[in-house]
Amino acid sequence: MSHIDDLRAALADPPIEYRPEQRWWLAEGLHTDDTLRHEIDRAHRLGFGGMEFLAMPEESIDESRYGWGSEEWTHDSRTIVSETTARGMSFSFTSGTNWSNANLPTITPDDDAAAQELDVVYEDVSGSRDGALPRTELDAAYDGPDLVFERIPGKTQRFVAVVAAAVTRGVTGGEAADEGRAGGGDGPDGATPVIDVASLTDLTGLVTGEGEERALTWSAPDERAWRLFVFWQHGTGQIARPSASVNYTINYLERDGVDALTAYWRDVVLTDDLRANIAANPRAQMYMDSLELNLSGQAGMFWGRSVAEEFRARRGYDITPWLPLLVRRTPMMAVSTRYRYEGDAAHGVEVAKVRHDYVETLTDLYIDNMLLPFKEFLNDNGIALRAEISYGLPFELTRPGVAVDGIETESLEFGSQIDAYRLLAGPAHLLGRQYSSETGATTRNHMLDHRFYDQIIATQLAAGITKTVLHGWSSPRGAEGTTEWPGHEGMLPMFSERFDTRQPAAEFYPLWTRAVGRLQYVLRRGRPRIDVGILRTAHFTDNSSGMMFVDDEGRRTADEDKYGRDWMRARRNHWWRDLGMQDAGWTYEFFDPSYLLRPEAVLADGVLAPDGPGYQALIVYQEALGADAAARLVELAREGLRVLIVNGASELKRLETGEYTEHERAASRTPGLDGRDAELAAAMAELRALDAVAEIDDQAGTLDALRALGVTGYHEFAAPNENVLTYERRDGDLTHVYVYHFLYETGRETTVELRIPGIGAAHRLDHWGGRLHEAASRSDGGTSVVPVTLRPGEVAIITLDRSGAPAEAGAPDGAGSGDAGAAAPPS
């Protein structure tokens, strides 16, 4: 059977593993075996491919009997695993109760296995001071505007350090440029006080006493205003419900946390019967949602007993003297970080580098001490790890992709925005990971039509997201006295949606799930072909960019209006703001430069990672670039990889406040305080001298500059088109190009001529009917030209079958390199 015949056969009824899956909010452990079987059977009959299940708190319920960890919940979990496995469906555990983080009933805030933070107490010194050092108030209510979370404080704190600094005038947020934010500090009128960086003095060695009883005798060296920063470590006390006892959030930075987590799963959860069911299901998963780790202390810093030691080992200097300049407040997500103190202007770059080094170290520890050992444990037990890896916390966005089996994004925090989905596409494609999304959450439950959600899925497919997990499913049955029509909500009444049997649309779900399954089936075949990789390091990516729905006068704007008429649908992409490549039909995505140092980043046939995305060119635009990555760029460019240096580019910093980061000169310094700026400058000078490298000072010239370097899209439009997004898979003799008319509210019918290298028969997928129809095409040299007409919001997949073409008419090297068969891993 030929590839095209194999494709036709699979499209008639796509296998269950390609169907959309569901997040299932369970009313604690209240279900009976019969109701669980009923719900799973209904989901299966409607065509859903799997159930990601979690416990949600119910009012007036005895959590000691029904909460996470109880016998009732444990029994229900085993039943779900058994029943989904029996139907060929996947199942996904969560790493604790509800969705927010990994949490356990076996730890307390005073244990190293529980989440820890660094707290600070201030003392102003005029002249001399002598006596006990102030301690933090563990049970004090946090006075900031931060997101409210539940906590039960611990009883102990550990002395960490005391640092003195001369504090001078305040600055406004606009005066300080940094990777987080300035403003909202501890100075008068909310101004941010300025520290004389040269005055920072580590006094820890002068402290006497033991445990929590510490004292210091010290005299200020001059008459300036001096402040002592007294740092203490304690547990965050963050808890999660529902729990049969109390579940505390674990430590994500030190091995104590993951060791406690794996011990609990090994010794308590994974019984012999459960292990047998897991072994029978090839798609058993552990799912980790967006990282909702909260702090209550005044320093706002994630910490642990070994963080300072790890910082020194990894960054090469002592973090202690710099701690006052790391003190922060984070009103919501990491993007809202506000440093309470700024350094003087003369040391601005130095301070920014230290701040980068701190969050880079946090990322290292999250990867090494949480994700990698957890993944190893899960894989050893037949479970894959799927995770929303970084956003919301100051971890680098893409680097943790190396430590999971599946990389996930979501629609709630990123909206229906193609650039947001490109942010994590790079590591997914480079590593060959399944790229998925938690899709459908808004704050307008039961208010939006089905087309709205179809358009989110269509946008995500254009970035290579080929696994849709719907948000979500809830049984109509719920706790007596708290469940109202049209049924149990589970994920709070305001958050959409309920893709379950209560919906009138459920009548056509079998047709819909097959249609989505066909699209996902085709777009997982073979290898992705992405034209351009954009190097981007980000610890504070705005993951609230899909949630800010307020107009200039402070009035609420409906989600459907922002999704359908604003941002990308008003020609405003957030991170790569020039639209020239997109309008040409080219594809591009982002990843951290450290990926260039990985074994996947090999060059063959003029493309980077030919067994993955096959990038034909790389773009460098941010001011900060590591010296090792720059040296690797020189090697790659010498071997023929095209590199474009773009100066003067800007990217979104925070949508809510309208802030953008301006990159005056690309790769002009290293990110951290590593003393390698001169080494970077030398490497960039060498890079600029190479024939495969170009440099521009206007982002709008990107497409022309890449064409001048000899880049031709894997597929491209015969003429620019502002209505259509594309995504390509190379599948042996077949090339699949997904096309999507994304202006579903404001556009008109459009026809685009799609140029695909190679000569062959063109087909258009009818994803609703499961058929491939012959499509009109013509040849132009060695290229097939396929006209595609799309209505607003319509999607199509064009498949070019080159199996019957003469060898010389097949896809050429370069634009057609890197073919791979359908047996490739999903990415």
Regions found by a protein language model. Name each.
Residues 18-21, 32-37, 51, 61, ...:
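Carbohydrate-binding surfaces of carbohydrate-active enzymes
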